[in-house]
Amino acid sequence: MVNDSIFIKKGVELEIEVQSLAYGGMGLAKVDDFVVFVKNGIPGQRVLVLIYKKKKGFAEARIIKVLKQSPLATKARCDHYWICSKLQTLSYEEQLKEKEKQVVDAFQRIGGFTDFTINAVRSAENKFNYRNKMEFTFSPHRWILESEPEGVDSSFALGLHIPGRYDKILDIDTWHIQPDIGNKILGIAREVCLKNLDLKPYDPKTNIGFLRHLMLRFGVKTNQLMVNIVTAYDDINKLSPLIDTLLKEVPEITSMVNNVNTRKADVAFGEFENLIFGNSFIEEKIGNLKFEISANSFFQTNTYQGKVLYDEVLKIADLNGDEIVYDLYCGTGSIALYLASKAKEVYGFEVIRSSLENAEKNSLINKIDNVHFLKANLDTFFKSGQLPRRIPKPNVIVVDPPRAGMHPDMSGYLHKLKAEKVIYVSCNPTTQARDVKILNDNDYKIKNSVMVDMFPHTPHIETVMLLSK
């Protein structure tokens, strides 16, 4: 065993013990005080690893052999768990503990909150089959696993990207993070495509081929199901074998559309859409609210935990019906609409026009008339005085920014709105800690913090934080 970090370099083999999980899901080990991130490592494992990357302050390694298994280990349900649900080999209770430690570490290390703690952790009741949206990719370049026999056909794949590789796709027949009906659709689609030579997967390198993506959206509370077949050009007749077979063998399908993406960009939405069957949307419910979800609209990916998250926001907001609420980065307006019945007026601010259109539509569907949506680039909107004078100042502000957090001008200006409460919802504890430190410097103090496990078996973390003066 190497005991001095000076000998750690690319290609070196080490015997080390994984101590904890780092933010992002890699195992964390140390040689002396030098940090080694271990791909797919879990706390308590003793492993032989190969260093594949060395930087000034850390190294990354992959496991060659598990020398001693962790007492916290459990058997993964998905064969390919390491793609995007890499924590499946760690017991669920331990996953929550590790995620909580990561949030605490971020607030202590980045925010300087030495006494920071999480007040509550909301675990997930549905630990599998919870994703209401999946995007699978067709490819003529299949990733061949070491465990597969020689001579396996690599000219067709329907599955997911290998982490860090965008040129090859791992063929997947079962993915337990999505509803079971999704796995049935995957199998049928693969079988039909292999039998029909015209249904060739698209190759972004050569710009040749037809099938690009298979997107599935599930209304888990409404039993509705959308299939979106994304193609490289418009040819419904060529799609007929796939369309006919899916509609015949999967009667649960309530919506089928074809997005056409003629661009080289490898994205699962197109310049236009063909409606094939049913409506161009499905419906979903969170609490008493109903939402229409089109192929390309944003919606919380876990309906079950989405309600848990919104209930936490509503609970810590503690509204009495007289408050003016601002929902910043409101997206399609789901939080704003969820709070509306307990507030006097709610104002949602969002820069993306299509999201605002969905928000307006959802307010009409739910017959809510005390929510108002404004197009606003929040990097500059308030600081440059663009807020209309007719809009009253807020009592409560809800902030739910993208992973990058708030723009410095926004986080630095927020206190000037003089709200009594700020509720910060975040999927990134590192940027949240940075922003909360700025709010703290402007007299907003942390009063409550709750972690909601939105995506079990993944490294993703969601937190809801109450700050007040």
Residue ranges and their predicted role:
Residues R217-G219:
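Structural signature of eukaryotic scaffold interfaces centered on beta-propeller domains
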